[in-house]
Protein backbone atom coordinates (compact mmCIF):
# COMPACT_ATOMS: atom_id res chain seq x y z
CA UNK A 1 0.00 0.00 0.00
CA UNK A 2 1.32 3.41 -0.97
CA UNK A 3 1.74 5.71 2.02
CA UNK A 4 -0.50 8.76 2.09
CA UNK A 5 -2.07 11.13 4.60
CA UNK A 6 -4.81 8.63 5.46
CA UNK A 7 -2.80 5.40 5.38
CA UNK A 8 -3.41 4.64 9.05
CA UNK A 9 -7.14 4.66 8.43
CA UNK A 10 -6.76 2.52 5.34
CA UNK A 11 -4.81 -0.07 7.33
CA UNK A 12 -7.86 -0.65 9.53
CA UNK A 13 -9.73 -3.69 8.23
CA UNK A 14 -13.09 -2.12 9.04
CA UNK A 15 -12.25 1.08 7.13
CA UNK A 16 -9.85 0.21 4.35
CA UNK A 17 -9.35 2.18 1.16
CA UNK A 18 -13.05 2.12 0.30
CA UNK A 19 -14.09 3.39 3.72
CA UNK A 20 -11.61 6.24 3.51
CA UNK A 21 -12.93 7.10 0.05
CA UNK A 22 -16.41 7.39 1.55
CA UNK A 23 -15.03 9.58 4.33
CA UNK A 24 -13.38 11.81 1.73
CA UNK A 25 -16.80 12.40 0.15
CA UNK A 26 -18.54 13.14 3.45
CA UNK A 27 -20.15 16.49 4.24
CA UNK A 28 -20.54 17.42 7.91
CA UNK A 29 -22.52 20.21 9.53
CA UNK A 30 -21.38 21.28 13.01
CA UNK A 31 -23.50 23.62 15.12
CA UNK A 32 -21.19 25.14 17.72
CA UNK A 33 -17.44 25.83 17.58
CA UNK A 34 -16.88 25.63 21.32
CA UNK A 35 -15.79 22.88 23.69
CA UNK A 36 -17.38 20.01 21.74
CA UNK A 37 -17.13 21.49 18.27
CA UNK A 38 -13.40 22.15 18.64
CA UNK A 39 -12.16 18.54 18.92
CA UNK A 40 -14.94 17.20 16.71
CA UNK A 41 -14.04 19.49 13.82
CA UNK A 42 -10.30 19.01 14.29
CA UNK A 43 -10.54 15.24 13.95
CA UNK A 44 -13.02 15.38 11.09
CA UNK A 45 -10.71 17.72 9.19
CA UNK A 46 -7.61 15.65 9.91
CA UNK A 47 -9.52 12.53 8.81
CA UNK A 48 -10.15 14.09 5.42
CA UNK A 49 -13.89 14.62 5.09
CA UNK A 50 -14.84 16.53 1.97
CA UNK A 51 -16.61 19.48 3.57
CA UNK A 52 -17.19 20.89 7.05
CA UNK A 53 -19.72 23.64 7.64
CA UNK A 54 -19.32 25.11 11.12
CA UNK A 55 -21.85 27.50 12.64
CA UNK A 56 -21.32 29.81 15.60
CA UNK A 57 -22.35 33.42 16.22
CA UNK A 58 -20.21 33.85 19.36
CA UNK A 59 -16.74 35.39 19.64
CA UNK A 60 -13.62 33.91 21.21
CA UNK A 61 -13.27 34.88 24.87
CA UNK A 62 -10.31 34.33 27.19
CA UNK A 63 -12.35 31.94 29.36
CA UNK A 64 -13.01 29.76 26.30
CA UNK A 65 -9.35 28.83 25.91
CA UNK A 66 -9.42 26.48 28.92
CA UNK A 67 -11.26 23.89 26.80
CA UNK A 68 -12.00 25.21 23.29
CA UNK A 69 -8.74 24.03 21.81
CA UNK A 70 -9.37 25.15 18.25
CA UNK A 71 -8.97 28.81 19.28
CA UNK A 72 -5.91 30.68 20.57
CA UNK A 73 -4.79 33.97 22.10
CA UNK A 74 -4.20 35.56 18.71
CA UNK A 75 -7.87 35.13 17.80
CA UNK A 76 -9.45 36.61 20.94
CA UNK A 77 -12.50 38.64 19.90
CA UNK A 78 -12.76 36.84 16.56
CA UNK A 79 -15.93 35.05 15.55
CA UNK A 80 -15.65 31.41 16.61
CA UNK A 81 -16.72 29.98 13.26
CA UNK A 82 -14.09 32.10 11.49
CA UNK A 83 -11.46 31.18 14.07
CA UNK A 84 -12.27 27.50 13.63
CA UNK A 85 -12.05 27.84 9.85
CA UNK A 86 -8.54 29.29 10.12
CA UNK A 87 -7.40 26.42 12.33
CA UNK A 88 -8.99 23.70 10.22
CA UNK A 89 -7.58 25.05 6.96
CA UNK A 90 -4.12 25.04 8.52
CA UNK A 91 -4.53 21.40 9.54
CA UNK A 92 -5.88 20.12 6.23
CA UNK A 93 -6.16 22.42 3.21
CA UNK A 94 -7.77 19.57 1.25
CA UNK A 95 -11.01 19.99 3.22
CA UNK A 96 -13.54 22.63 2.21
CA UNK A 97 -14.42 24.70 5.28
CA UNK A 98 -17.52 26.88 5.34
CA UNK A 99 -18.00 29.20 8.30
CA UNK A 100 -21.37 30.67 9.28
CA UNK A 101 -20.81 33.55 11.69
CA UNK A 102 -24.44 34.18 12.65
CA UNK A 103 -27.36 32.25 14.08
CA UNK A 104 -29.24 30.90 11.05
CA UNK A 105 -32.99 31.27 10.77
CA UNK A 106 -35.13 28.22 10.16
CA UNK A 107 -34.99 28.37 6.37
CA UNK A 108 -31.22 28.79 6.32
CA UNK A 109 -30.80 25.99 8.86
CA UNK A 110 -32.91 23.71 6.69
CA UNK A 111 -30.69 24.51 3.70
CA UNK A 112 -27.55 23.80 5.72
CA UNK A 113 -28.90 20.48 6.98
CA UNK A 114 -30.09 19.43 3.53
CA UNK A 115 -26.55 19.81 2.19
CA UNK A 116 -24.86 17.58 4.80
CA UNK A 117 -24.53 13.82 5.25
CA UNK A 118 -24.36 13.95 9.04
CA UNK A 119 -24.99 16.72 11.55
CA UNK A 120 -23.28 17.34 14.90
CA UNK A 121 -25.04 19.09 17.75
CA UNK A 122 -22.25 20.79 19.69
CA UNK A 123 -24.37 23.53 21.21
CA UNK A 124 -24.96 24.46 24.85
CA UNK A 125 -28.46 25.80 24.27
CA UNK A 126 -31.42 23.52 24.89
CA UNK A 127 -33.88 25.38 22.68
CA UNK A 128 -31.41 25.20 19.79
CA UNK A 129 -31.04 21.45 20.32
CA UNK A 130 -34.78 20.90 19.90
CA UNK A 131 -34.95 23.00 16.74
CA UNK A 132 -31.88 21.29 15.24
CA UNK A 133 -33.30 17.88 16.17
CA UNK A 134 -36.60 18.63 14.42
CA UNK A 135 -34.94 19.89 11.23
CA UNK A 136 -32.63 16.85 11.02
CA UNK A 137 -35.62 14.56 11.64
CA UNK A 138 -37.72 16.13 8.89
CA UNK A 139 -34.83 16.03 6.42
CA UNK A 140 -33.80 12.49 7.44
CA UNK A 141 -30.21 13.36 8.35
CA UNK A 142 -28.26 11.48 11.07
CA UNK A 143 -27.66 13.63 14.15
CA UNK A 144 -24.82 13.12 16.64
CA UNK A 145 -25.53 14.98 19.86
CA UNK A 146 -23.46 15.38 23.01
CA UNK A 147 -23.52 17.51 26.12
CA UNK A 148 -21.21 18.28 29.04
CA UNK A 149 -21.89 20.04 32.34
CA UNK A 150 -19.24 20.11 35.08
CA UNK A 151 -17.93 16.50 35.27
CA UNK A 152 -20.91 14.84 33.54
CA UNK A 153 -21.11 14.05 29.85
CA UNK A 154 -23.41 12.20 27.49
CA UNK A 155 -23.59 11.30 23.81
CA UNK A 156 -25.97 9.53 21.46
CA UNK A 157 -26.90 9.26 17.78
CA UNK A 158 -30.31 9.71 16.18
CA UNK A 159 -30.28 8.14 12.72
CA UNK A 160 -33.25 9.78 11.06
CA UNK A 161 -32.74 7.77 7.89
CA UNK A 162 -34.66 5.13 9.86
CA UNK A 163 -38.36 6.13 10.00
CA UNK A 164 -38.65 4.44 13.41
CA UNK A 165 -35.77 6.40 14.94
CA UNK A 166 -36.26 8.08 18.29
CA UNK A 167 -35.47 11.78 18.47
CA UNK A 168 -34.01 14.18 21.05
CA UNK A 169 -37.48 15.04 22.33
CA UNK A 170 -38.23 11.34 22.92
CA UNK A 171 -35.20 11.12 25.17
CA UNK A 172 -35.56 14.52 26.83
CA UNK A 173 -39.28 15.44 26.66
CA UNK A 174 -39.22 18.22 29.25
CA UNK A 175 -36.65 20.96 28.88
CA UNK A 176 -37.94 24.04 30.66
CA UNK A 177 -35.23 25.62 32.78
CA UNK A 178 -32.65 22.92 32.07
CA UNK A 179 -29.95 25.03 30.42
CA UNK A 180 -26.78 24.61 32.48
CA UNK A 181 -23.79 26.41 31.02
CA UNK A 182 -20.08 26.42 31.69
CA UNK A 183 -20.32 30.05 32.78
CA UNK A 184 -22.48 29.08 35.77
CA UNK A 185 -21.74 25.39 36.44
CA UNK A 186 -18.15 25.11 35.25
CA UNK A 187 -16.80 22.38 32.99
CA UNK A 188 -13.94 19.88 33.28
CA UNK A 189 -11.81 20.75 30.25
CA UNK A 190 -10.68 17.25 29.15
CA UNK A 191 -14.25 15.97 29.25
CA UNK A 192 -15.43 18.13 26.35
CA UNK A 193 -12.39 16.89 24.44
CA UNK A 194 -13.40 13.29 25.09
CA UNK A 195 -17.01 13.78 24.05
CA UNK A 196 -16.17 15.93 21.03
CA UNK A 197 -13.76 13.28 19.78
CA UNK A 198 -16.48 10.68 20.24
CA UNK A 199 -18.83 12.81 18.15
CA UNK A 200 -16.22 12.84 15.38
CA UNK A 201 -15.87 9.06 15.68
CA UNK A 202 -19.62 8.54 15.36
CA UNK A 203 -19.77 10.83 12.33
CA UNK A 204 -16.90 9.00 10.63
CA UNK A 205 -18.55 5.63 11.27
CA UNK A 206 -21.76 6.86 9.67
CA UNK A 207 -20.03 8.40 6.65
CA UNK A 208 -17.56 5.55 6.22
CA UNK A 209 -20.20 2.85 6.78
CA UNK A 210 -18.30 0.84 9.36
CA UNK A 211 -18.76 -0.09 13.00
CA UNK A 212 -21.97 0.32 14.99
CA UNK A 213 -23.17 3.88 15.71
CA UNK A 214 -24.65 4.81 19.09
CA UNK A 215 -28.24 4.71 17.85
CA UNK A 216 -30.79 3.89 20.53
CA UNK A 217 -28.14 4.12 23.23
CA UNK A 218 -27.29 7.04 25.48
CA UNK A 219 -23.73 6.79 26.75
CA UNK A 220 -23.08 8.71 29.98
CA UNK A 221 -19.85 9.37 31.88
CA UNK A 222 -18.99 10.75 35.31
CA UNK A 223 -15.44 12.02 34.87
CA UNK A 224 -14.87 12.25 38.63
CA UNK A 225 -14.68 8.46 38.77
CA UNK A 226 -14.50 7.83 34.99
CA UNK A 227 -17.58 5.65 35.37
CA UNK A 228 -19.50 4.92 32.19
CA UNK A 229 -23.16 3.94 31.95
CA UNK A 230 -25.32 3.06 28.97
CA UNK A 231 -29.07 3.50 28.73
CA UNK A 232 -31.08 2.04 25.86
CA UNK A 233 -34.08 3.95 24.61
CA UNK A 234 -36.60 3.85 21.79
CA UNK A 235 -39.07 6.11 20.07
CA UNK A 236 -41.79 7.55 22.27
CA UNK A 237 -45.21 7.10 20.64
CA UNK A 238 -46.40 10.16 22.56
CA UNK A 239 -43.48 12.36 21.52
CA UNK A 240 -44.76 15.79 20.46
CA UNK A 241 -41.97 16.05 17.88
CA UNK A 242 -41.90 12.73 16.03
CA UNK A 243 -45.01 10.71 16.98
CA UNK A 244 -47.39 9.65 14.24
CA UNK A 245 -49.48 12.44 12.81
CA UNK A 246 -47.19 15.20 14.13
Task: Name each model-derived stretch.
Residues 1-246:
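Adenine nucleotide-associated cytosolic modules
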Amino acid sequence: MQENRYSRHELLREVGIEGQKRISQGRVLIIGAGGLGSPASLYLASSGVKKITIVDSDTVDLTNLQRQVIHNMERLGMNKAESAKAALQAINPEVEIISVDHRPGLEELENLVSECDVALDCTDNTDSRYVFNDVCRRLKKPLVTAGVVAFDGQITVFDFRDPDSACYACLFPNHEGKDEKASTKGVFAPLVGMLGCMQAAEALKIIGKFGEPLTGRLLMVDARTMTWRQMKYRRDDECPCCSQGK
